[in-house]
Amino acid sequence: MSADLNRDYEIGEEIGRGRFGVVHRCTSRSTGEAFAVKSVDRSNLADDLDRELAEIEPKLAQLAAAGNPGVVQVHAVYEDDSWTHMVMDLCSGPDLLDWVRLRRGAPVPEPVAADIVAQLAQALALCHRRGVAHRDVKPDNVVLDVEDDGENSSPRARLADFGSAAWIGADGGRAEGLVGTPHYVAPEVVSGGDYGEKADVWSAGVVMYVLLSGGALPFGGETAKDVLSAVMRGSVRFPPRLFSGVSPAAKDLMRRMMCRDEWRRFSAEQEQPT
């Protein structure tokens, strides 16, 4: 741990672990306020792309979060020759994946799912206007602040983990590289060419599908390769046993979000359900 980080924060228990780093609870020594700190040991990253992503993450996370209530806020960054530490909001609830799993296969009520997706769309729209593509939108990377007001109340949802993010500029720039999570990645990413911010919209469409189906995924397979093949060749279907109670408008929105033609796909601005 950085000496400067330890000077300013008391480091507590581990609360999460991901591909690149580990997350601990921490407490400000000056105010007593609780935060989360994500720590990445860059010296352990052998892949050039991984090192590049780890180096740029703090800058893109701060840019995406500033004045954006739908993104977990970054309060401080500490870096030395090997480590990067980001002090961030400590969210009170689970991530969206765990929240869905707690429902044991029951679909999220459509108004609640629509509200969560609208919050995600608003967050992504501001990220995209600032030239940041997240590139790994999935339930695991959406954290919740949940009020105990019944199953039909909507939690506050915030986008987290910019560890795969790319700078594309605010003028419709493009990114490259197979980055993201197989079940949520857009076909243009899988194809190996360049792609824009609408890859995030595809991923958000998969998130909406997961919410309304009670945890099912639109594209599956036994291996990551199988899943990516399904993403490339498949089309979105809504099995009646899972979607009989979902409105035509919600299904149409998901089709537009997961449109295979990137140029006809909704933008994050258009994505917000009504």
Model-derived features: positions:
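Conserved N-lobe ATP-binding subsite of Hanks-type protein kinase domains
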Residues: V22
